[in-house]
Amino acid sequence: MLGIFFLGVLAPASLGLSALAKLQPTGSQCVEHECFALFQGPATFLDASQACQRLQGHLMTVRSSVAADVISLLLSQSSMDLGPWIGLQLPQGCDDPVHLGPLRGFQWVTGDNHTSYSRWARPNDQTAPLCGPLCVTVSTATEAAPGEPAWEEKPCETETQGFLCEFYFTASCRPLTVNTRDPEAAHISSTYNTPFGVSGADFQTLPVGSSAAVEPLGLELVCRAPPGTSEGHWAWEATGAWNCSVENGGCEYLCNRSTNEPRCLCPRDMDLQADGRSCARPVVQSCNELCEHFCVSNAEVPGSYSCMCETGYQLAADGHRCEDVDDCKQGPNPCPQLCVNTKGGFECFCYDGYELVDGECVELLDPCFGSNCEFQCQPVSPTDYRCICAPGFAPKPDEPHKCEMFCNETSCPADCDPNSPTVCECPEGFILDEGSVCTDIDECSQGECFTSECRNFPGSYECICGPDTALAGQISKDCDPIPVREDTKEEEGSGEPPVSPTPGSPTGPPSARPVHSGVLIGISIASLSLVVALLALLCHLRKKQGAARAELEYKCASSAKEVVLQHVRTDRTLQKF
């Protein structure tokens, strides 16, 4: 029975269950972090299982000989064989003592069948199988092991005289210690209550969550444990120490009873914590961690320091914090007109009609004063303006102080000289029509975009380049086609060699390509230059021809008498040599 703590026969405690109001715990055992309790009274397997669950536990699992020894101790305290339920059941199917392992096909209420122990009252060689639903009780009145608890299969609807519950806890506390040298100790007694409803005074260990009532001091203590620890300690809701005779007043180090109220003391190198009972070493802080802004250490006195604050702050009464100084309330006023305090400083403002210039409030001037707007200046703020234009005009994008004609319609009135009504101007992209009306030029109808999509707007147009251009899908007036190299074309066909065209055979005309307007202008200029050059050459040749003819006539007239004409035969004759 290693690791078993005998808790003795405990006083009855109500389960708080209407269906099992008569069932009361009669004993309890704790092994490490598990506690087991025996409840006496008639109950079916379902009633027993629900009763354990209401107490935050479940029917007992007997996985080792240690758990079997706990059952023996609990049953030995009863004068009759209760045959209590344990947490082993066969919901459906039949058992098999030979092929289904030590549990014969049964499983624990926790949903598994892991075990290193089994003790069946029915021998394994019994041939007739038992079929579920079946549940298991333990009894000491069996033929297989008289006096030793053995497992018996029974229908789950059977009412037994008790059941065993199992509870798991992460930590536990020792019973309260009382200082026997204290004269008051002889009159002090403690009564404990466990979370699963068992109460009494004779315990070896108590699970976390148990409570202790100490009389006649009127103390109510609770077993608690920090998260992640297995060793609990007794505590109460109030801070500070309780009576030093019980559990050292809850103090971690010393309990001082020399004063009217008990007080906990800590070693010199440790500080008392907020609960008034535990001790901890102080956290060493650097000088800068002690002051809100700046800390200056005193080299002459080790451990001493002084705190300082930034500009606009002053040191608080505690000597560590820094408080903001309201500069606006300091005399004289640091601002010429309005002052607004800020954290660590202030801001100056001026009344309406004034602006802050170099720390002074000066009266605002008309923002249009000195402006160079061509038509009219319009203030937009006390310090800014914008230029506006007459109807039919708009500010130039690159020179907003100047105006240019603007028309957002297909036709608008022209800007004519009042002294010369025939002298009129139109916005760019418009043409003067009917003397005083500017009409939009439809560049799209003039083929400005060639084969690309064209969109006309008042005074302008845009081209959307086609898919066969380098800027396909983009808006541009330079939608040049993608150049195609003839030597990179691949011949496609049936695999026969290509046939070269014979001389004189007609060939298809070359595909028409759109020509850019700049190219057309260049061609026109070159053609005109060529015509002018040809005309000049023709004039030169005619002049030269006239001079030569005059010279020839003169020569013919002066040598007419000296010329002897000789008859020349035109027929061919053979000459012999």
Curated annotation (Swiss-Prot):
Domain EGF-like as annotated: residue spans: 240-280, 283-323, 324-362, 364-404, 403-439, 440-480
Superkingdom, taxonomy of origin: Eukaryota
Matching PANTHER family: SKELETOR-RELATED, THROMBOMODULIN
Annotated glycosylation sites: N113, N243, N256, N408, S494
Chain ranges of the C-type lectin domain: 31-167
Tissue specificity annotation: Endothelial cells are unique in synthesizing thrombomodulin.
Spans through the membrane: 518-541
Reported consequences of knocking out the gene: Thbd-deficient embryos die before embryonic day 9.5. An overall retardation in growth and development starts on embryonic day 8.5.
Pfam families for the chain: cEGF, EGF_CA, EGF_Tme5, FXa_inhibition, Lectin_C, THBD
Annotated protein name in UniProt: Thrombomodulin
Chain intervals with Basic and acidic residues compositional bias: 477-492
Keywords: Blood coagulation, Disulfide bond, EGF-like domain, Glycoprotein, Hemostasis, Membrane, Proteoglycan, Receptor, Repeat, Signal, Transmembrane, Transmembrane helix
Quaternary structure note: Interacts with ITGAL, ITGAM and ITGB2. Interacts with thrombin/F2; this interaction switches the specificity of thrombin from a procoagulant to an anticoagulant and antifibrinolytic protease. Interacts with ANGP1 and ANGP2; these interactions significantly inhibit the generation of activated PC and TAFIa/CPB2 by the thrombin/thrombomodulin complex. Interacts with PF4; this interaction enhances generation of activated protein C. Interacts with HMGB1; this interaction inhibits HMGB1 inflammatory activity.
CDD domains associated with the record: EGF_CA
InterPro entries for this protein: C-type_lectin-like (IPR001304), C-type_lectin-like/link_sf (IPR016186), cEGF (IPR026823), CTDL_fold (IPR016187), EGF-like_Ca-bd_dom (IPR001881), EGF-like_dom (IPR000742), EGF-type_Asp/Asn_hydroxyl_site (IPR000152), EGF_Ca-bd_CS (IPR018097)
Comp. bias (Pro residues): 498-512
One Gene Ontology term from the biological process aspect of the record: response to cAMP
